[in-house]
Amino acid sequence: MTKTLPKDFIFGGATAAYQAEGATHTDGKGPVAWDKYLEDNYWYTAEPASDFYHKYPVDLELAEEYGVNGIRISIAWSRIFPTGYGEVNEKGVEFYHKLFAECHKRHVEPFVTLHHFDTPEALHSNGDFLNRENIEHFIDYAAFCFEEFPEVNYWTTFNEIGPIGDGQYLVGKFPPGIKYDLAKVFQSHHNMMVSHARAVKLYKDKGYKGEIGVVHALPTKYPYDPENPADVRAAELEDIIHNKFILDATYLGHYSDKTMEGVNHILAENGGELDLRDEDFQALDAAKDLNDFLGINYYMSDWMQAFDGETEIIHNGKGEKGSSKYQIKGVGRRVAPDYVPRTDWDWIIYPEGLYDQIMRVKNDYPNYKKIYITENGLGYKDEFVDNTVYDDGRIDYVKQHLEVLSDAIADGANVKGYFIWSLMDVFSWSNGYEKRYGLFYVDFDTQERYPKKSAHWYKKLAETQVIE
């Protein structure tokens, strides 16, 4: 049976400042940790990315033409405050006013994120969110933006608190490149959730007219053998690291006994302890019912198997299928079932995981209000032929995920929109320019845009709300 989506549904496209803007040192922008980290460790930089800093009128015109009525944008903190605090860079402020005005002119609603992986270098090198002083700097930055940009109706505090801690302190593929430090992972999650909660409370206390929420990446975790209690336990512990810890903070205002039991077990196995303060929980509790929406970023699921051994993680950054490895001491290891397809980057394609994750939020956190799928899409090495890309695989991937999203709505979940990652091709943090996701192909040499087959498909979807 053909499935549909609601008439008032947002059909969006997602971007991020550092992945799209380029212009990394233009008009007074301050450095971020990624600038030097990419130069030192990878074969690419964020210059020029998609040159969104100059090309945004083109991208927004394409968005309007192809039925995209919402766009995820992030503000580069170091464009506003080059060192993270102190003196305001007026040219940066002016850029975002012009960008938001163009969005409204094109009838593309901007959903604006304050922090998308790009803490200013001066604060990042000073401990990033492990340093509680930087919580205060983030709140000051948020307060400035809320007041300065009343034209923004939808605010997101953070993009993917989970993968920030994971990338910085577990896998080590994000600056500062620390590996296997689970205590830092949880402390980063916690301090960022406190920052989120305080920003949300500030926004509501000031009486601003818009909506505010947070975007979490929520990869669903399954036991490899659901009949094996040890595999079930491995999936539960992995879920705590990536999902439950931050969801509890968002909607319970504390960590459940089961969550803390898992955290304490993981830290007992791996070392370290957490600094959790009474005032932190007061902040979390004060904001738990104030989130207007939850953004869910979903790309993949994982299957977990019990494992007795040392931690080892190998990140597949070059699309060499089968080269990744993930096992954590005291938690488990990822072992994908043979029947589940995966991408060249070993990302498992499992649309049912999106349905299960949406329903998990609905059932476990009934104060959630509403959900947007804020990122979902398929990255691969697009073949540019005849000024387009015949990306049937991407269309099929998105279609399958929209179908289970439609099922979730039918089963009572309040899902109000979907943002494909990404609107146009952007650079990928740990994969560079080879891995493309966009509806529009970007020639990174000329910065020309070309609609892919998926762009035409998405336009028809947005016009009809029919998934076919």
UniProtKB/Swiss-Prot annotation:
Transmembrane regions: none
Q: State the EC number(s).
A: 3.2.1.85
| One BP annotation, GO | lactose catabolic process via tagatose-6-phosphate
* Matches recorded under PROSITE patterns: GLYCOSYL_HYDROL_F1_1 (PS00572), GLYCOSYL_HYDROL_F1_2 (PS00653)
> Known Gene3D superfamilies for this protein?
Glycosidases
Induction behaviour: By lactose. The operon consists of lacABCDFEGX.
Q: Which InterPro entries match?
A: 6P-beta-galactosidase (IPR005928), Glyco_hydro_1 (IPR001360), Glyco_hydro_1_AS (IPR018120), Glyco_hydro_1_N_CS (IPR033132), Glycoside_hydrolase_SF (IPR017853)
Q: What class of enzyme is it?
A: hydrolase
Pathway assigned to this chain's UniProt record: Carbohydrate metabolism; lactose degradation; D-galactose 6-phosphate and beta-D-glucose from lactose 6-phosphate: step 1/1
Q: Where is the active site?
A: 160 (proton donor), 375 (nucleophile)
Keyword tags = Glycosidase, Hydrolase, Plasmid
For this chain, the family text in UniProt reads:
Belongs to the glycosyl hydrolase 1 family.
HAMAP family found in the cross-reference section: LacG (MF_01574)
Q: What's in the misc comment field?
A: This gene was sequenced from pMG820, a laboratory-derived deletion of the naturally occurring plasmid pLP712.
NCBIfam families (UniProt xref): lacG, PRK13511.1
Record protein name field: 6-phospho-beta-galactosidase
**Protein's gene:** lacG
